[in-house]
Design a protein with these regions (language model features):
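C-terminal active-site-proximal or functional interface alpha/beta core segments in diverse enzymes
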Residues: 65, 70-208
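Active-site-proximal beta-alpha core segment in soluble small-molecule metabolic enzymes
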Residues: 1-101, 185
Length: 208
């Protein structure tokens, strides 16, 4: 739908619209990472061939890059997704599409707390509050993924990790240092293909 809308606007303005495809459906081992964001990677090849090569349906759209957004903050999942994006960019190159950048959505992990003990204390006090041992510390005593069922505290915390052992530039470096099956790492692969890797700094002004 977005391609159709952007095409219509570009035609109306008589301009070329610079676009990046947001893709999803990456594999971590045998597990597929489903997402509400983007085109499924397994369908992208046929979509591009049908709409950009075999017809002029989107002739006012100019491809420049790829983007993906994953839930959570797993370094492994981001590394594997970037690996699959780079592999897909190779396929696109064979079709005449140059990938100038790949954008990793979700942002770089930042530490909003200065000390790990502060994060540990919040986790501890949240569990006490949910168990009605102290006054609520969240709105309406929400458990943020934790809950009491049959008198037992269950679930896992699903809030943003306010303190991390791996954050800032180290978080991105860890992703880019992931080794590929062809030898070398993701950073070297991207550099050899002239692909810029982008990642938003998140709420970096709040970093401790």
């Amino acid at each position: 739908d977005e391609c159709v809308q952007v095409q219509e606007i570009a035609v109306e303005l008589n301009k070329q619209a610079i676009i990046a495809f947001r893709i999803s459906g990456f594999y971590v081992g045998e597990r597929k990472l489903y997402s509400r964001f983007g085109f499924d990677l397994e369908t992208m090849d046929s979509f591009i061939s049908t709409n950009f090569l075999e017809s002029e349906r989107f002739d006012h759209l100019t491809y420049k890059g790829l983007h993906f957004h994953l839930n959570g903050y797993s370094v492994e999942e981001r590394s594997l997704a970037l690996n699959q994006c780079l592999a897909f960019s190779e396929l696109l190159s064979q079709k005449g599409f140059k990938t100038e950048f790949i954008d990793i959505g979700g942002g770089i992990l930042m530490n909003y707390l200065k000390y790990e003990t502060e994060w540990d204390n919040f986790n501890h006090q949240l569990r006490r509050a949910i168990s009605n041992k102290i006054d609520p510390i969240t709105y309406e005593n929400q458990g943020l993924g934790l809950q009491i069922l049959a008198g037992v505290l269950q679930g896992e915390l699903k809030s943003y990790p306010l303190w991390n052992t791996l954050s800032n530039g180290d978080f991105l470096r860890k992703i880019l240092a992931h080794n590929t099956s062809a030898g070398g790492n993701l950073a070297q692969w991207a550099k050899s293909r002239g692909v810029e890797i982008r990642m938003a700094p998140g709420s970096s002004m709040l970093d401790q």
